[in-house]
């Protein structure tokens, strides 16, 4: 007797099943075939724009996880760039075979994924708007040449403020929204999972929990999303721990948001966690893993956000070789949805101040 090996063999129409969970972003591209449909492996090239602490942590993590056959590094400081490239090249005997190059934007030609970490540093006393405008000026120099050299690439923005700069990169690149992604709250969600895992004494990989919205002070913790080992956990946590009141929950959310500030206060900058976070996104994208990550996407039309507001913020999205393959339809409380809409309104207002 033949045993069914898939839902379709059991009579389910599995072809469109994902549409019940995910919706495409506006201005998106159709999904690419799964990697199993590609007959021969092609070489993979990743470019990292910005060779600072974050950029080099990302490059190092990509190397050790064997995610690319070639890495191109670009930075405004040529001596530092050459030093960083040489330092990695000297480790060739201990790493998978990879070609490392680095000068200007021309070395990014034919990239599969371009990761932008470059950003202007805030001057003491400088307003947030002025800093944002200087970052836009920097992106005008970075993004159009990158888009010209790699017109089919995926663009992953890591620079802060990541949600607004992802919007800027989308506008300047001319790419469809499905191919422009911000690192968003992927790392915030990892910190959220870590805190819950520490409390329950379980492995963080067995915890599922999302932070969504703006990557910043107004990020939204989706408490109902918490599961441990696939089992919903928030209700049992509240039932067994009376201390899990609204004030305590807000304290946990603030601890997640403040995690980066704590690290910066202790060592001066963040690097390793964001390196692993971005590498996980690169793997999901380039290996067509179709994993769900909370990343900054074009959120128009989701959860009551106006269709007319072109704003990027983090929502759980399915990632694959085509970029954003769909955004999960979360079941939010009205309070959570209202917080998300407030974040969207603030981000939209910031975007309107830019000359794009």
Swiss-Prot record:
Active site residues according to the UniProt entry: 215 (proton acceptor)
InterPro entries: L-lactate/malate_DH, L-lactate_DH, L-lactate_DH_AS, Lactate/malate_DH_C, Lactate/malate_DH_N, Lactate_DH/Glyco_Ohase_4_C, NAD(P)-bd_dom_sf
Residues bound to NAD(+): 75-80, 121, 160
EC number, UniProt record: 1.1.1.27
GO cellular component, one term: cytoplasm
PROSITE patterns: L_LDH (PS00064)
One GO-annotated biological process of the protein: lactate metabolic process
Superkingdom of this protein's organism: Eukaryota
Catalytic activity, as annotated: (S)-lactate + NAD(+) = pyruvate + NADH + H(+)
GO molecular function: L-lactate dehydrogenase activity
Gene3D superfamilies cross-referenced by the UniProt entry: Lactate dehydrogenase/glycoside hydrolase, family 4, C-terminal, NAD(P)-binding Rossmann-like Domain
Protein name from the UniProt record: L-lactate dehydrogenase A
Record carries keyword Transmembrane helix: no
HAMAP family: Lactate_dehydrog (MF_00488)
Induction: By hypoxia.
Keywords annotated in UniProt: NAD, Oxidoreductase, Stress response
Pathway membership, UniProt: Fermentation; pyruvate fermentation to lactate; (S)-lactate from pyruvate: step 1/1
Complex formation: Tetramer that arise from random association of LDH-A and LDH-B.
CDD domains: LDH_1
UniProt lineage: Eukaryota, Viridiplantae, Streptophyta, Embryophyta, Tracheophyta
Family from the record: Belongs to the LDH/MDH superfamily. LDH family.
Residues annotated to bind substrate: 128, 160, 191, 270
Keyword Lipid biosynthesis belongs to the record: no
